[in-house]
Amino acid sequence: MPAETGNRAEESQETLPAKGVQERRSSDSALAKGDINFDDLKFDLAKDAPFDSGLISDDLKQLDGREVTLRGYILPSTLFSETNISQFVLVRDNQECCFGPGAALYDCVIVEMVEGNTTDFVTRPVTVAGKFVIDTESYRYPPDLSPNGATHMAIFRIEGMDVE
């Protein structure tokens, strides 16, 4: 029997699960099929720190050039039209954290639909299928316009074949 400390709050804190959102990476079988999620894209980058390509893990590098499916939300503020959309930003969720400054670099993916393919805006989650690309050059902030020292708007792209 555990020794009593007389402090129930202290005792109960020891048995509570850790706070925060649990990371849920794709299983090996899902990855083999190209089914990825935003947790698979995470890497260790401090908030407002400049991007360093050395932080990208070998597991993440293995996704580069592969056909994948990724589920998320179309970021509405990146659209000029609600129909026949050929380029948009796919984000992890529709919460405020992904819509403003401070969103993690790995929580958004630029989707550029391949020629002849488009999609329409919806407020529900979508699944994008296409070729995953790690692109550390195309989405850099201009040096004098980078917010809080950030260097990139995005580093991931999907060349979209289909959006469901």
Give a label for each model feature.
Residues 1-164:
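OB-fold and OB-like single-stranded nucleic-acid-recognition modules
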